[in-house]
Design a protein with these regions (language model features):
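Pocket-forming structural segment of enzyme catalytic cores
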Residues: 91-166
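Conserved catalytic-site region of short-chain dehydrogenase/reductase
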Residues: 86-88
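N-terminal beta1-alpha1 cap of cysteine-dependent amidohydrolase-like domains
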Residues: 1-78, 83, 96, 107-112, ...
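Active-site catalytic microenvironments for nucleophilic, acid-base chemistry
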Residues: 19, 90-91
Length: 167
């Protein structure tokens, strides 16, 4: 189930899943709390600023509580994509300081471009460095190329929650 809260890159997510899992999964896009609760897996996309995505989540009455119950209380798999993942943090500093979902202790901050060493926004294909076994990377080889479009990064307090990095 893909959560539709009017701030996600939903068409890109649907196209990606259709490309890699066509006929293997049933994709449903919804903001219906009952459908989200009854799902076995949920995807939380996100596009735009941290603040706008958090505000959009909060604008749907009961959605944050439903996602908390789903992921934290019931420990069901929830995949955050882009800002969807960043919102798992305690806090984000894009635009203004904004409280996140608080599922993973840490903060979302602007990427340190190390005095121009890295161009921002970070756009393009980069290799990922898998540093920890994770279900999300089960069938993905280390140094695989992934596509990135972002200027902010999630810095968790506990580095043991990091599964992969990129330069």
């Amino acid at each position: 189930t893909i959560v539709d809260y009017n701030s996600g890159n939903i068409s890109s997510v649907i196209n990606s899943f259709n490309e890699v899992a066509k006929d293997k999964i049933n994709i449903e896009v919804t903001s219906d709390l009952k459908k989200i609760k009854s799902s076995d897996k949920v995807i939380l996309p996100g596009q735009g600023s941290f603040k706008n995505c958090v505000d959009a989540l909060n604008s749907i009455n009961g959605l944050v509580d439903t996602l908390n119950e789903f992921a934290i209380n019931n420990k069901k798999p929830l995949l955050g994509i882009c800002v969807g993942l960043q919102m798992f943090a305690d806090i984000g500093y894009e635009e203004i300081e904004t409280k996140g979902l608080g599922w993973i202790s840490g903060a979302v901050t602007k990427i340190d471009n190390q005095n121009g060493k890295y161009k921002l926004p970070h756009i393009g294909w980069n290799q990922i460095n898998i540093i920890k076994n994770s279900r999300i990377f089960k069938d993905i080889e280390n140094n695989s190329h992934m596509y990135f479009v972002h200027s902010y990064e999630f810095i968790p307090e506990d580095k043991n929650v990091i599964s992969a990095t990129t330069d």
